[in-house]
UniProtKB/Swiss-Prot annotation:
It is found in: Secreted. GO terms for biological process: regulation of blood pressure. This peptide acts as a hypotensive peptides, but its action is not related to angiotensin-converting enzyme (ACE) inhibition. This is Bradykinin-potentiating peptide POL-236. The modification Pyrrolidone carboxylic acid is found at residue 1. Keywords: Hypotensive agent, Metalloenzyme inhibitor, Metalloprotease inhibitor, Protease inhibitor, Pyrrolidone carboxylic acid, Secreted. The lineage of its organism: Eukaryota, Metazoa, Chordata, Craniata, Vertebrata. GO terms for molecular function: peptidase inhibitor activity. The keyword Cell membrane does not apply.
Amino acid sequence: QLWPRPQIPP
């Protein structure tokens, strides 16, 4: 199952 990866700010 795929889950949304946490958005890491640049």
